[in-house]
Structure formats: C-alpha cells, structure tokens
Curated annotation (Swiss-Prot):
Keyword ATP-binding: yes
Class of the enzyme per the UniProt entry, highest EC level: transferase
Entry binding sites for ATP: 15, 164-166, 230-231, 239, 245-246, 262, 266
Swiss-Prot/TrEMBL keywords: ATP-binding, Cytoplasm, Magnesium, Metal-binding, Nucleotide-binding, One-carbon metabolism, Potassium, Transferase
Name the record gives this protein: S-adenosylmethionine synthase
Cofactor: Mg(2+); K(+)
Protein's pathway: Amino-acid biosynthesis; S-adenosyl-L-methionine biosynthesis; S-adenosyl-L-methionine from L-methionine: step 1/1
Protein's organism: Haemophilus influenzae (strain PittEE)
Amino acid sequence: MSSYLFTSESVSEGHPDKIADQISDAVLDEILKQDPKARVACETYVKTGMALVGGEITTSAWVDIENLTRKVICDIGYEHSEMGFDGHSCAVLNAIGKQSADINQGVDRENPLDQGAGDQGIMFGYATNETDVLMPAAITYAHRLMEKQAEVRKSGKLAWLRPDAKSQVTLKYEDNKIVGVDAVVLSTQHSEEVSQKDLHEGVMEEIIKPVLPTEWLSKETKFFINPTGRFVIGGPMGDCGLTGRKIIVDTYGGAARHGGGAFSGKDPSKVDRSAAYAARYVAKNIVAAGLADRCEIQLSYAIGVADPTSIMVETFGTGKVANELLVSLVREFFDLRPYGLIKMLDLIQPIYRETAAYGHFGREQFPWEKVDHAEDLRIAAGLK
C-alpha cells in the first residue's frame, strides 16, 4: 500500500497580492461593461498608504480608476488606519498606457474567427474526481477555509479578525485515496486586544471545524493556528502586493502543472487567461464524462495565430480510452481558437473580479465549470 502527503495553500481576499488581483479585475470588469472590444492588461501594486494601477489598455470606455480602487479596498475590509491600510485615504496612482499597435495587428482580424492569440504561451487545465467540483481536495478546502474566515469576519461573529489571512491543508493519501487530514495551518490577522486563547478557540470552532469533513479529522491531525503567536500587522503594511503573484493558489494548488501566465487584469483575448479557462473546461468535461479519473490538458499558442500549436491530454493511467482518442475528441467538440473559446465560454462579460479571490476553478458560477459536453464525449468515445 502506497501512502503520501499532499499540501496546498490559499490566501484571503485581504492578502496584499489578492488586493492587487481584485483591483486589476475590477478595472477589467468596468471596462468590459462599456467596451466589449477593449484590450486590457492591468497591473496593480499595493504598499502602505498607496495603490499604483498601471498597464496597457486600449478602450473607448472611461473608468474612474481612483474611486474604483478605493471601493475595492474598502469592500475587502481595509476601511480605517488601525487595519494598517485605509481605502478612503490611501494614495491612488494611475500609470496606464495603450496596448502596442504591433500586438494589435497580430490579434485583430477582419473575420473574428481568425483572431490571433494575443501572445505565445503554454496553458494547463486539470480535473480530478476526488471532490464533487472535480478539483483537487487540498486546494478546495484551503479556499473554503479562507471563504469562511471572510464570512465570520464580515458578519461580526469574530469581530477581532482582520482581512489578511492564509491557510494550508495537508492531506494523507493511501493508494491514491484520501484517508484524512494530516495538518492544517491557518494564520489570520487580528486586532491588538484579542487573547491567543480566544483566537485559537474562535478559529477552530468557527472556521476550521465547520469546513473540514469530520471523518477526515482525528487525534493525529495537527493544527497550527497563528503559529508565530501574533499577527496584528498585515495587509499592505506587512507586505507589498502585486497582481499575478498567486498563480498556484489561483489554479490547482500544485496538483497540476502551470504554464506560468497569471490571470487577473487580462481581457479574454489574452490566452494566458482564456485558454487556461478553456483547458479546465475540457479537462472537467472529460472527467465528468467518466473518460478518466484525472485529466490534464496542455494547450499552446503562437502570437497572431488562431489555431493552437499543440493539444496534449494526460490521464495518469486513469483513462478509460486512449489519450490519442481523447485528443481527437477535444478537437471535435471544443473550438480552442481565441475567438472560438471566447464565444464558447461567453467570456466577454464582467465576471472577473469575483474570480480574483478563492480560486478561479471549482466554483460553479463560472462558465468554464459547465459540464455540458460530458454526455457527448461519453457517447463519441463509445462508453455506455
């Protein structure tokens, strides 16, 4: 019997890098509401007392960058100086330019179907049947811990919580099946006055226990709650934050490969984002169809070229049919050209700020989580 441990981490919406992601995606959403053809690459940097929003944007839309940035920061919970960051009073700097005309000529086409990829690159998508949302379990539960932290903070149930937090979940596997939680790490920013006893008890009873399956917990499970003992200074006062610095948190928690391209602040013409969503969509439909227990898709593109330069399917020995057949089915049922996948997944809509915390995958409200091709794939593969 083979046994091993696997760990994934998540961070809260108040983590500095996630503040930056949410600002960048909020800018993207506001632009897409006004200009569906906009080209957006928005980057954000946050540090004590300031937020810098920059990048390359070509659009007919007008967005009040300053007020939008302040709103995002305040919505997260940084509303007064005792938090170490205040959306009402921080400086907001704007350093936005236009997209290069050299890129435009390679992307835009008279026939939209011929739209070229906005850049070269490789993208991966992944799915596994170890959770109901067809995502790896460690990252799924790490995200849920962070969502619960935000819920009890914002509701006032644990009023001493502050926005910055991190989680980490280590699962124990035997013969590739989860048999329990080996360790949980949860570090959360808090107010000055809360005692360590109250903090430990509150986090355990209101965050950890309601989220993790009771059958996975045992007397051997290790819990590390604020292991340094104090976490008052947090958010951008503790660390600077940058868009695109949490690409593993955003995807599969290290359970699958990553092409290296970040998502937030990029419009769907950027295949770093849209093709990674499409790859997840393809992998999830293959697993939902019962064609594999685990599936990883790799796509690659050349700048200015519509068709993917490669498609790879890997099922890690769990496939019910040959990988070569799966590749041909992917080509048959999924249009993976940039314009095709944008239409297939209805990506020109203001949905991106919501993706920028708690993971881009495994959340059913997003169109790339549909399994509407699962039955077609199953029939075409000849499975009963």
